[in-house]
Amino acid sequence: MKILNNKFYVTTPIYYPSGKFHIGTAYTTVLADTMKRYHQLKGEDSYMLTGTDEHGQKIQGIAEKSGKTPKEYVDEMAAQAKELWAKMEIHYDDFIQTTEERHTKVVQKIFDKFMEQGDIYKGEYEGWYCVPCETYFTETQLVDGKCPDCGREVKLMKEEAYFFNMKKYVDKLVKYYDEHPDFIKPAFRKNEMINNFIKPGLEDLCVTRTSFDWGIKVLKDPKHVIYVWLDALTNYLTALGYMSDDDTLLKKYWPADLQIVGKDIARFHLIYWPIFLMALDLPLPKTILVHNWIMMKDGKMSKSKGNVIYPETLIDRYGLDPTRYFLLREMPVNQDGIFSPEAFVERYNFDLCNDLSNLVNRTVSMVNKYFEGNVPEYNGTPNVVDKELEDYATEKIKKFEEKLNDYEIANALQEIWDLIARTNKYIDETMPWSLAKEEKIEELKSTMYHLIENLRKIAILIKPFMTDTANNILRQIGIVDTDKIRWNDIYPYDTLKDIKVIEKGEPIFMRLKVDEEVEYLKSVMKK
């Protein structure tokens, strides 16, 4: 398969619609959307896939309890997901439901292909089964006799099943790990897979079930339904038209450049998924990024603990961009992120209001005060303080690119906020009010130009994360065609000519009353 450059294909996991999506699901999706927007900004042909994983015993049970057929239930949940992603301005290109014919028919073809190749065989499965996780475990994998992933009770089950011969490909997989260091990020996840699953002896994977019927039937043995992971993982291919009459998208976008998954489904994506692709003789994704969870101070989110927060709650009260910013800023690479009402309000007040909004407001006000809103042009001969700011901005932009290209999202945002802080410091260093008083007009012009220019750079940097805020900043500093902004515009320092800031600067973010908002968030988390 010919691999095209200058394209970017990013996927989220397809989400299991067993209930309302909380901020953990929102984080994954916002992250994918941010990376898509960044690569679009760089002029790349970018494509994002998301969707819902709709088969299995758990869905069948939930649908029955709610008095609906499984299909009615999953369609309702998919509609809710699309509504949420619209509210969060997620620019996905395709939303796949695994109950769609374009998926189910191809999964059956893939199963038959594996059978013909001798990758799948029939046997009998006995193991400890976790219904919520839809996963079998050996006795040694259990933790205190319970599911190692979710901590719930497991059942000993025995049934006829088809198995995928994982052992056949395991050496090839480990070799691939070693030869492709960018395949798994962060890198420590590779060692987890090897030490926890591969070295102890990788079990063959059960890929069908007979104890329920809500799933894709095996064509040549219809009492079997194809089990969740062979069904779910292949959505990344079926959505592009793999094994269909039209595989244009597959030729254009596969292999995926970035696949984002939570740590709870890491082994399925880092072991089973690449092995399936090897068996199909398809190229593997360039990078699979495994992120941690968003936790509460008292552990995982749970309705019984009264600590669940939904993205709609944050968006309706504080706006979309602060919600996106908080989710992306609070998730470190190597550990779980923590959500607390106090942390959310603090980020809003300090980062967005004090640092960013005040910088925009002060700068626009000064250009209006000293130059009637007309932005002076670049003089080409920066003084020492100006040059230090220019060099610092260039350095921070390069570091930002390095961090974002390595998917260190929170660290990339830190580089932007370092630049915001340095630009605020530049105002204190240059003291424009003193320059005006002393009638040092050329120095004052250079200072105003550098402030506006840095705001332009900051707006471009935050555009993938907070598009509306970026466009607001650009509009306030006199750049109207925000849709024409491209990443390559970010480095030059002499791009602004004949522009005028708006007459009265508008605060982008207004300071929150800490006690009031903390109490509000605590109250809605208990509902």
Which residue ranges define each predicted feature?
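Generic structural concept
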Residues: 353, 357, 390, 394, ...
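A charged helix-plus-loop insertion that forms the helical arch/lid used to bind
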Residues: 62-75
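Long, amphipathic alpha-helical stalk/connector segments used for oligomerization, subunit docking
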Residues: 332-335, 339-343, 348, 363-387, ...
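Short functional micro-motifs and their immediate structural scaffolds
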Residues: 138, 155-156
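Short, charge-patterned binding micro-sites
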Residues: 52-58
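A broadly conserved sequence feature marking short terminus-proximal activation segments
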Residues: 73-129
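Basic, alpha-helical terminal appendages of large translation-related enzymes
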Residues: 1-7, 51, 68, 123-128, ...
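Structured secondary-structure scaffolds
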Residues: 2-50, 97, 102-106, 156-369, ...
